[in-house]
Curated annotation (Swiss-Prot):
Keywords: ATP synthesis, Hydrogen ion transport, Ion transport, Transport. The gene is atpB. This is V-type ATP synthase beta chain. NCBIfam families: PRK02118.1 (NF002555), PRK04196.1 (NF003235). Produces ATP from ADP in the presence of a proton gradient across the membrane. The V-type beta chain is a regulatory subunit. HAMAP family: ATP_synth_B_arch (MF_00310). Pfam families: ATP-synt_ab, ATP-synt_ab_N, ATP-synt_VA_C. One of its GO terms (molecular function) is proton-transporting ATP synthase activity, rotational mechanism.
Length: 438
């Protein structure tokens, strides 16, 4: 039996306080307004009989005489095959004009997957982006962010990864998006040809903060059902996790919580970890691979959001000057696939290329300071130009095997075989034959 409460004692921001009994944290409530409209709210805290709820869609138009009905369940999202190809908002309602989604309601904010049923990641996710495939491999079930400054093309990178991987289903969770960003996701998914296997959960910048917080939970709840029930390999793309953290901060401030670092709530680490830990490779089942975008205000890597994220995830891609910076990027799972599911020369070649490129940066610094350059410095600078053009540029779109072959060609065009520090048996097998004795 549902109990109706009519005594709203306080309205502040997107929060209301009502005198009620028996409410649970996270419980969903329906607010019936005196004008006949209704909206939903979620329980954030309670103190004796005073229950504080966050109202979806804001409190504009609410009055203290509105009726509050506690539904006895937490927030749910519709799950089913009809979800594929659809776009929904932060409360799970369609926004694409295609009518209602049909399926079974499933709870969000569920616990992470049972560790006993997880398996060690073993498969590579190929993206056709050399700076990922060659140097920091993306592994199935990996959780990894893209650290990006404002103005970088991180959304374009996300869409390219979505289009070029072999994931069965792509789920995009957009948080704090402008209309331009939202339109870009819709148009690019159609242009790149994966709209028919894509689900989008969209929170726009003008929507309520609580809807922003729900976006990752909805996306990951659906991803887990697809992976468990249908053995699907699901790629989840979340952008922007800084907007997610800002929504948490706004809610915490409204609730008069004591802030921690730079105003963010003290629970920021656990709030982020709860979402990232949903990435999983399921024994005899599907998988969830999670890539997020975390923008760094002021290009500050020590900002609380990227700083906490780095302790949770299995590496990061550092997007800088519209390139994936090899020195700021890391994949902690790449050793599980390099040389095991890729070519035998992969590891040695990648290490040699990065080492020589690091040396070229030192040579470029010496040149900028007016030092006389040695012949070796000149070789390094010539190598760096080829490396940046043929491998580092995000415009390069080639399979892993071709990228490895290009890496060998770049080395052969710039150095003698004995100068690159690669094992002789690999030199004899992969060094371009026309340059074998250089």
């Amino acid at each position: 039996m549902q109990t109706i409460y009519t005594k709203i004692t306080d309205i502040k921001g997107n929060l209301i306080t009502v005198e009620a009994e028996g409410a649970r944290l996270g419980e969903l409530a329906e607010i019936e307004r005196v004008d006949g409209r209704s909206s939903y709210a979620s329980v954030l805290r309670f103190d004796a009989k005073k229950v504080t709820l966050q109202v979806f869609g804001g409190t504009s138009g609410l009055s203290t005489g509105d009726r509050v009905i506690f539904l006895g369940r937490s927030m749910e999202v519709t799950y089913g095959e009809s979800l594929i190809g659809r776009r929904l908002n932060g409360v799970g309602k369609p926004i694409d004009g295609e009518g209602e989604c049909f399926g079974d309601p499933i709870a969000i904010s569920t616990p992470t997957f049972n560790p006993v049923c997880r398996v060690v990641p073993r498969d590579m996710v190929k993206t056709n982006i050399p700076m990922i495939d060659v140097f920091n491999c993306l592994v199935k079930s990996q959780k990894i962010p893209i650290f990006s400054s404002s103005g970088e093309s991180h959304n374009a990178l996300l869409m390219r990864i979505a289009a070029q991987t072999d994931a069965d289903i792509v789920i995009i969770g957009g948080m704090g998006l402008t209309f331009v960003d939202y339109s870009f996701f819709v148009d690019e998914s159609k242009r790149l040809g994966f709209a028919d296997k894509c689900v989008m959960f969209i929170h726009k910048a003008v929507d309520a903060p609580v809807e922003c917080v729900l976006i990752p939970d909805m996306a990951l709840a659906c991803a887990e059902k697809f992976a468990v029930d249908h053995n699907k390999n699901v790629l989840v793309l979340l952008t922007d996790m800084t907007a997610f953290a800002d929504a948490l901060k706004e809610i915490a401030i409204t609730m008069d919580q004591i802030p921690a670092n730079r105003g963010y709530p003290g629970s920021l680490y656990s709030d982020l970890a709860l979402r990232y830990e949903k990435a999983v490779d399921i024994a005899e089942g599907g998988s969830i691979t999670l890539i997020s975008v975390t923008t760094m205000p002021g290009d500050d890597i020590t900002h609380p959001v990227p700083d906490n994220t780095g302790f949770i995830t299995e590496g990061q891609f550092y997007l800088k000057n519209n390139r994936i910076d090899p020195f700021g990027s890391l994949s902690r799972l790449k050793q599980l696939v390099i040389g095991k599911v890729t070519r035998e020369d992969h590891g040695d070649l990648a290490n040699s290329l990065i080492r020589l490129y690091a040396d070229s940066r030192k040579a470029a610094e010496r040149m900028s300071m007016g030092f006389k350059l040695s012949n070796w410095d000149k070789k390094l600078l010539a190598f760096a130009e080829l490396f940046e053009t043929r491998l580092m540029s995000l415009e390069v779109n080639i399979p892993l095997e071709e990228a490895l072959d290009i890496g060998w060609k770049i080395l052969a065009q710039s150095f003698h075989s004995e100068e690159v520090g690669i094992k002789e048996q690999l030199i004899n097998k992969y060094w371009p034959k026309s340059c074998l004795h250089r």
